[in-house]
Amino acid sequence: MDKYKFKQVDIRLKLSQAKPLYSTEQITTAQKAVEVMAEYLSERDREYCCVVNMDAANHPINFNIVSIGDTNHTPVPMQNVFKSAILSNAASILILHNHTGRSLTPSTFDVDMTLKMVKAGRLMNIPVLDHVIVAGSTYDRCFSFKEQEPDLWNERIYP
């Protein structure tokens, strides 16, 4: 037994209690989410994907830039989407990403990724409230998967 000696390392994570960084407003619609996050997603030269971690009353706890891609795609690793939600003890999450052009049309990848995230959120009991695509510089328009593709949240269709 003395042949192997291991050093035990204790690691602890602590979230500091600070004032909200960007909003204390309740987010109940896709447009409200865009208003809150516009300054972080506007005028980007490539696609960004971010997650807003929400408390039980749909107030933002914090947000996390999950990935930065190129001009027409950003990879979205599932573990990165839920990591900050778990560490923040979030009750739910909201996913947003930008399209660098003016098109709000979701790609096949966007649809597939949304479905995977909704299913993963169900498994972890951290619901995905919506996945919102924004485009252009004013962000007066957005594409809400929850509003436009509600079947993605239907467990009977997508168990």
Task: Name each model-derived stretch.
Residues 22-84:
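Glycine-rich, small/polar surface segments that engage phosphate groups of diverse ligands
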